[in-house]
Amino acid sequence: MKRKKKEEEEEKLIVTREFAKRWRDLSGQNHWKGMLQPLDQDLREYIIHYGEMAQAGYDTFNINTESQFAGASIYSRKDFFAKVGLEIAHPYTKYKVTKFIYATSDIHVPESFLLFPISREGWSKESNWMGYVAVTDDQGTALLGRRDIVVSWRGSVQPLEWVEDFEFGLVNAIKIFGERNDQVQIHQGWYSIYMSQDERSPFTKTNARDQVLREVGRLLEKYKDEEVSITICGHSLGAALATLSATDIVANGYNRPKSRPDKSCPVTAFVFASPRVGDSDFRKLFSGLEDIRVLRTRNLPDVIPIYPPIGYSEVGDEFPIDTRKSPYMKSPGNLATFHCLEGYLHGVAGTQGTNKADLFRLDVERAIGLVNKSVDGLKDECMVPGKWRVLKNKGMAQQDDGSWELVDHEIDDNEDLDF
């Protein structure tokens, strides 16, 4: 009975949307012209769809430094989306995670970027879980109108700490974009996480870039006879990596199957709270590419999107929201509530515009309690505890002999899965 009711609810949600018919427009074929102000209803839910896939990176990331698995994924790829709450009432999240992404850095970066366990027995002293690659199953492909390959980059744990503490230098990106674009410069932190490798770690013997390109290439080859899209998503640090990754894929032709170099697929990045990525030459390179679109959702009171302030250029199309208009959120807000991804998705769900006269109205059925997942941003009358997302008993589980142990990691060999 419950399963039948669930299926009926999903069917009801599906018939109100036209993702399959409109996916090219929703993915920015025409740079979202006429779709942002006022916000197209299908696009509203489409943005939330990919925002939730970025949020999954936070929900599975182990931030407990007392755990030997700090910096790893709590969940394995099997049933991944069910475990992060994206199965029930999420009819379009019909994806399978095919690969986990790991990263390291050959320069010092803040703990909010890479987090390591205190224990000497920690799973890794060099690498962090940095995201995943997923692809629609056959049902998801039918619902979304094409085979969708998703690359989701994890964001920073405590992003506000690095605004003042991190040196925002630019470095040459010739190793990514080649001698043709030897003037392009990228933020040193984003570049290091994207390009660094460490032979000591089994997780980052190849850098994050090559891990992604290999898996995307494998999936493109597998589905070369189908209509395919590549969608990349991320928040904060993850947004910067998503922008860099999307540009890399298109600039170097990695959006084409090796056996079908004549067949390119569109690449769209949905990024939230994105800091700036590169200089004016990076923007020039980006602007000259045909198959790429980036939609930057920006909460107006959030300070992160204006960093770094000097020497950088923004790319893509901006979609402004203002969560200060929400009648559910505390006023005044603070840096954390303005920046958190769940706050952003709440803003997307209710935005009617950012002008003074524009109101806020939730046009999708999205629980307001999600805002408080990692912050304390809702008004007290909403009756939702702040920072409520924690593992049951903080991961402590009773064993058969009556003892208690920290169980906060599912083993995953990360070998290629063929769904």
UniProtKB/Swiss-Prot annotation:
Coiled coil ranges: 1-21, 207-227
InterPro entries: AB_hydrolase_fold, Fungal_lipase-type, PLA
A Gene Ontology molecular function term of the record: monoacylglycerol lipase activity
Domain of life, source organism: Eukaryota
Record bears the keyword Repeat: no
Disruption phenotype: Mildly fast-growing seedlings regardless of the presence of an exogenous carbon source, accompanied by a better beta-oxidation and mobilization of seed storage oils.
Main location: cytoplasm
Enzyme Commission code: 3.1.1.-
Reported pH dependence: Optimum pH is 5-6 with 1,3-DAG as substrate and at 30 degrees Celsius.
Cross-referenced SUPFAM superfamilies: alpha/beta-Hydrolases (SSF53474)
Tissue specificity: Expressed in seedlings, stems and siliques, and, to a lower extent, in flowers.
Enzyme kind, highest EC tier: hydrolase
One GO term (biological process): diacylglycerol catabolic process
Keywords in alphabetical order: Coiled coil, Cytoplasm, Hydrolase, Lipid degradation, Lipid metabolism
PANTHER family: PHOSPHOLIPASE A1-IIGAMMA (PTHR31828:SF1)
UniProt function note: Acylhydrolase that catalyzes the hydrolysis of 1,3-diacylglycerol (1,3-DAG) and 1-monoacylglycerol (1-MAG) at the sn-1 position. High activity toward 1,3-DAG and 1-MAG, but low activity toward 1,2-diacylglycerol (1,2-DAG) and 1-lysophosphatidylcholine (1-LPC), and no activity toward phosphatidylcholine (PC), monogalactosyldiacylglycerol (MGDG), digalactosyldiacylglycerol (DGDG), triacylglycerol (TAG) and 2-monoacylglycerol (2-MAG). May be involved in the negative regulation of seedling establishment by inhibiting the breakdown, beta-oxidation and mobilization of seed storage oils.
Protein name: Phospholipase A1-IIgamma
Organism: Arabidopsis thaliana
Organism classification: Eukaryota, Viridiplantae, Streptophyta, Embryophyta, Tracheophyta
Gene symbol of the encoding locus: DSEL
